[in-house]
Amino acid sequence: MKTGVKKLKVHVKKNDMVTVISGNDKGKSGKVLRVYPVKGRVIVEGVNIRKRHMRPTQSSPQGQIIEREFPVHASNVKKG
């Protein structure tokens, strides 16, 4: 880890059930899929869905648009 980078104490862990308390997805709930303690963010299942444009590859020659969860700040979620 880089020097000078401070880990934030995150009050939730992976597989915890949380509810979003602020932002566009306020009121939604889901399971924590991943925690980023250095950034103080968490990825919650079904929350903060964004579309990603994937470039063409050999397996999908036309490319595709996929929807996936993006991180939300840990202060915007609560357990329960």
Curated annotation (Swiss-Prot):
Coiled-coil annotated spans: none
Pfam family, one: KOW
Keywords, alphabetical: Ribonucleoprotein, Ribosomal protein, RNA-binding, rRNA-binding
GO molecular function terms attached to this record: rRNA binding; structural constituent of ribosome
Gene3D superfamilies assigned to the protein according to its UniProt record, in alphabetical order: 2.30.30.30
UniProt keyword annotation of rRNA-binding present: yes
GO BP term (any one): translation
InterPro entries: KOW, Rib_uL2_dom2, Ribosomal_uL24, Ribosomal_uL24_CS, Ribosomal_uL24_KOW, Translation_prot_SH3-like_sf
Cellular component annotations (GO), alphabetically ordered: ribonucleoprotein complex; ribosome
Quaternary state and interactors: Part of the 50S ribosomal subunit.
Family, as annotated: Belongs to the universal ribosomal protein uL24 family.
Entry-linked NCBIfam families: rplX_bact
Function recorded in the entry: One of two assembly initiator proteins, it binds directly to the 5'-end of the 23S rRNA, where it nucleates assembly of the 50S subunit.
Listed name of the protein: Large ribosomal subunit protein uL24
Organism this protein belongs to: Chlorobium phaeovibrioides (strain DSM 265 / 1930) (Prosthecochloris vibrioformis (strain DSM 265))
